[in-house]
């Protein structure tokens, strides 16, 4: 395998996210195919790290360069960011960080700019202390776009700084123990026998946080389906849903299938229909079902038009993990900060309400619908459910909040989990 310059690959990945609006989960895997297994982790660290601290790196470039890099030289802008990130946030020796970053100019066919890159990075090293002192008083220090900061400040006047701080951390690795194979405690013993350790969640019975992240192939019984990687807060959805054997259950917006398989672990005799609008992502649902040795009906379909994929069918329980801004999982997907726009929130809220209204008639009388998002914004959460309850006379809220303040909102970092919202509705 030809030796690749990781800094240039990271710069290209970040450029595709920020300039072209592509998701890092789509951009990164093809680039990782080009590098050795040893280098995959560093490439990922550089991409995630630059996107996590982008506001800081952009601020530094504006301070140290008189004019922005544009056109075909734009990738160099991101290459310099990769250089700053290494000097500030990694243990890579500065001389190696500088040399590899400067060499990255050759890999992106801009060798004439090696001197410029070297000069900017060395200037930063000389002025680092003064620059960081000034940065610490700027709005950029929060590492969030200003539109999102304003929304968080308005919705959480006393908590917004804690939310921002949690969003800027590296996420822990949560697992879901498959209760059809092992209890959480018995699998934890296997984990400890393998030289690792984990900590159980206080509320969600299958959730276990690893002491430090590990590759999945090192986890006891991963290939056999004994355990799944899933954040604790995502596991809350099925706790609220409380599926039972023999029931017909709809998992709507199901990809990549983590909640589909969790439903089947909790109720192995349930009949589950998993539906998602994104055909490509449905392949992940099949993969998850196969690894865990489970069966469900999987269909491509738009939640706004259920008659197209389920006819007149009605369900005992529906889990609607609605499309949302994903503002609760920024620490896990830092590209979200730069992919979302303020105007997206109203559009997402409209889509959520359309799906809720369309799917409600497909819930049996006496049935349960759990509405969930990985957002922290009230427009997508409590306000969404409040409006739905007002226009839907046969819907009643149960066990999640109050009619005036419906739902349960987990904030990022609470018991080390992601930000998530849940509302449990019963059809009268």
From Swiss-Prot:
Transmembrane segment boundaries: none
Keyword terms: Cytoplasm, Methyltransferase, RNA-binding, rRNA processing, S-adenosyl-L-methionine, Transferase
Location of this chain's protein in the cell: Cytoplasm
UniProt cross-references to InterPro entries, sorted A to Z: MeTrfase_RsmB-F_NOP2_cat (IPR049560), MeTrfase_RsmB-F_NOP2_dom (IPR001678), NusB-like_sf (IPR035926), NusB_RsmB_TIM44 (IPR006027), RCMT (IPR023267), rRNA_ssu_MeTfrase_B (IPR004573), rRNA_ssu_MeTfrase_B_ent (IPR023541), RsmB-like_ferredoxin (IPR054728)
Biological process, per Gene Ontology: regulation of DNA-templated transcription; rRNA base methylation
Reaction catalysis annotation: cytidine(967) in 16S rRNA + S-adenosyl-L-methionine = 5-methylcytidine(967) in 16S rRNA + S-adenosyl-L-homocysteine + H(+)
One Gene Ontology term of the molecular function aspect: rRNA (cytosine-C5-)-methyltransferase activity
EC number: 2.1.1.176
Keyword Transferase: yes
Sequence positions that bind S-adenosyl-L-methionine: 253-259, 276, 302, 321
Function: Specifically methylates the cytosine at position 967 (m5C967) of 16S rRNA.
Annotated NCBIfam families: PRK10901.1, PRK14902.1, rsmB
Family stated for the protein in its record: Belongs to the class I-like SAM-binding methyltransferase superfamily. RsmB/NOP family.
Descriptive protein name: Ribosomal RNA small subunit methyltransferase B
Protein species of origin: Citrobacter koseri (strain ATCC BAA-895 / CDC 4225-83 / SGSC4696)
Name of the gene encoding the protein in the UniProt record: rsmB
């Amino acid at each position: 395998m030809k030796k690749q310059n990781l800094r240039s690959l990271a710069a290209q990945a970040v450029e595709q996210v920020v300039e072209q609006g592509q998701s890092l989960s789509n951009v990164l895997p093809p680039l990782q195919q080009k590098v050795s297994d040893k280098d995959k982790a560093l490439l990922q660290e550089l991409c995630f790290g630059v996107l996590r601290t982008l506001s800081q790196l952009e601020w530094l470039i504006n301070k140290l360069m008189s004019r922005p890099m544009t056109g075909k030289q734009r990738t160099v802008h991101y290459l310099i960011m990769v250089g700053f990130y290494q000097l500030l946030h990694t243990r890579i020796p500065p001389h190696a960080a500088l040399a590899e970053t400067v060499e990255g100019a050759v890999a992106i066919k801009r060798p004439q700019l090696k001197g410029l890159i070297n000069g900017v990075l060395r200037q930063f090293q000389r002025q680092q202390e003064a620059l960081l002192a000034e940065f610490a008083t700027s709005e950029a220090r929060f590492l969030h776009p200003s539109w999102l900061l304003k929304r968080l400040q308005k919705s959480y006047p006393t908590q917004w700084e804690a939310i921002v701080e949690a969003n800027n951390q590296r996420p822990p690795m949560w697992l879901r123990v498959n209760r059809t194979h092992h209890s959480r405690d018995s699998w934890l013993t296997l984990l400890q026998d393998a030289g690792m350790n984990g900590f159980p969640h206080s509320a969600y019975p299958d959730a276990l946080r690893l002491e430090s992240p590990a590759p999945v192939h090192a986890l006891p019984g991963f290939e056999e389906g004994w355990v799944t990687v899933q954040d604790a807060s995502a596991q809350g959805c099925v706790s609220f849903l409380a599926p039972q054997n023999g029931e017909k259950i709809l998992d709507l917006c199901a990809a990549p299938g983590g909640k589909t398989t969790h439903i089947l672990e909790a109720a192995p005799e349930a009949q589950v229909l998993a539906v998602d609008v994104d055909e490509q992502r449905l392949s992940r649902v099949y993969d998850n079902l196969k690894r865990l040795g489970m069966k469900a009906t999987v269909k491509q379909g738009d939640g706004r038009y259920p008659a197209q994929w389920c006819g007149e069918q009605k369900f005992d329980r529906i889990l609607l993990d609605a499309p949302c801004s994903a503002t609760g999982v920024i620490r896990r997907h830092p590209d979200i900060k730069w992919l979302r726009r303020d105007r997206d929130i109203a559009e997402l809220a409209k889509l959520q309400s359309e799906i809720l209204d369309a799917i409600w008639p497909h819930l049996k009388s006496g049935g349960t619908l759990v509405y969930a998002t990985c957002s922290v914004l009230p427009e997508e959460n409590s306000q969404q459910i409040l409006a739905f309850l007002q226009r839907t006379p046969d819907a009643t809220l149960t066990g999640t909040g109050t009619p005036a303040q419906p739902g349960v909102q987990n904030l990022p970092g609470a018991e080390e989990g992601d930000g998530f919202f849940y509302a449990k509705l019963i059809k009268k």
